[in-house]
């Protein structure tokens, strides 16, 4: 446990170091702390013994340690009002109408990346809890069919496929009816179970060649069980990382691994999560910050940034909060549009 003055000193050291990345001495704190230089030095020694600050080899000043940053984020930091300049940039980016959920998420990721200079990610509400609200099949020609899946979030998934040789147009109608009767209205997690238990038995009753029908089910619904991550600023790692660049770029390009990282640190009721101590050695000097945003009546999505341990946390958290608020506002407009008997425009 640290004293209130030590808390103020840690706050100042973190804030000042974030601005110019030079070690902080006791004299730099005199104007802001009501204490003598000797008292401040003693408090700095106490913080150093606790492992919250550390000495820089080339200077007599001190810099925050990883533990210090962690303590600062969890116990000291207070969100400041976002700047008018940041507000203007975010509102300008989100100006206009959005007819695709993916475009909203791309705009959010790009805004986060540009304002923080970090790599950013946007994740929708957990797929397993989403509901399949409608299913349609459109015959394009004698051989091609388009399936259209609509989820409760308004997200539309389309899949064009070649009609199996063993299936007739009448078989296709039976297939469509099976989906509507057995799968529409269920959550994705329940659909996954139904496809592996009930559907194989039902297919045997209605179709002569079951293998191609089951393969068609898998082809249409397989993508439904995969979460999609929106990424911006992958190349920003070259600005804030010096080691293991190839490994980092590979990680940021691997949606499955990043999804695991993000879900792992946000798997609780907290609206914000920060991870400093990463198991991956090549990420030991990086911090992952995630913040949930409200998806009206559908749950919570997640905004995430990855950057150096010595990032400006005050500004980064402020920008995350700003983008989350504006994104939720635009999502409200988007769902009002969808609820007016419109459909998401899908590419």
UniProtKB/Swiss-Prot annotation:
Gene3D superfamilies: 3.30.450.40, Heat-inducible transcription repressor hrca homolog, domain 3, Winged helix-like DNA-binding domain superfamily/Winged helix DNA-binding domain. Keywords: Repressor, Stress response, Transcription, Transcription regulation. One of its GO terms (molecular function) is DNA binding. GO terms for biological process: negative regulation of DNA-templated transcription. The keyword Coiled coil does not apply. Negative regulator of class I heat shock genes (grpE-dnaK-dnaJ and groELS operons). Prevents heat-shock induction of these operons. This is Heat-inducible transcription repressor HrcA. The gene is hrcA.
């Amino acid at each position: 446990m640290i004293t209130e003055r030590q808390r103020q000193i840690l706050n100042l050291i973190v804030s000042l170091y974030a601005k110019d990345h030079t070690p902080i001495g006791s004299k730099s704190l005199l104007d802001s702390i009501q204490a003598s230089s000797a008292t401040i030095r003693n408090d700095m020694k106490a913080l150093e013994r606790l492992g919250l600050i550390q000495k820089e080899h080339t200077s007599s000043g001190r810099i925050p340690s990883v533990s210090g940053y962690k303590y600062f984020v969890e116990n000291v930091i207070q969100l400041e009002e976002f700047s008018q300049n940041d507000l203007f940039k975010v509102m300008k980016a989100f100006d206009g109408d959005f007819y695709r959920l993916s475009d909203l998420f791309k705009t959010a990721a790009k805004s986060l990346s540009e304002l923080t200079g970090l790599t950013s990610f946007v994740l929708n509400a957990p797929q397993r809890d989403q509901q399949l609200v409608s299913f349609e099949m459109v015959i394009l020609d004698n051989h091609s069919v388009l399936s259209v899946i609509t989820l409760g979030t308004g997200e539309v998934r389309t899949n064009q496929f070649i009609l199996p040789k063993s299936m007739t147009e009448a078989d296709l109608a039976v297939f469509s009816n099976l989906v509507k009767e057995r799968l529409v209205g269920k959550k994705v997690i329940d659909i996954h179970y139904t496809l592996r238990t009930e559907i194989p038995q039902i297919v045997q009753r209605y179709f002569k060649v079951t293998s191609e029908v089951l393969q068609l089910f898998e082809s249409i619904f397989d993508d439904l069980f995969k979460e999609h991550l929106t990424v911006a600023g992958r190349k920003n790692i070259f600005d804030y990382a010096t080691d293991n660049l190839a490994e980092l770029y590979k990680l940021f390009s691997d949606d499955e691994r990043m999804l695991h990282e993000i879900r792992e640190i946000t798997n609780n009721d907290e609206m914000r999560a920060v991870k400093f101590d990463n198991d991956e050695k090549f990420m030991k000097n990086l911090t992952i910050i995630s913040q949930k945003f409200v998806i009206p009546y559908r749950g919570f999505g997640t905004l995430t940034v990855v950057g150096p341990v010595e990032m400006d946390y005050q500004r980064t958290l402020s920008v995350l909060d700003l983008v989350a608020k504006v994104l939720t506002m635009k999502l409200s407009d988007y769902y009002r549009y969808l609820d007016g008997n419109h459909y998401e425009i899908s590419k």
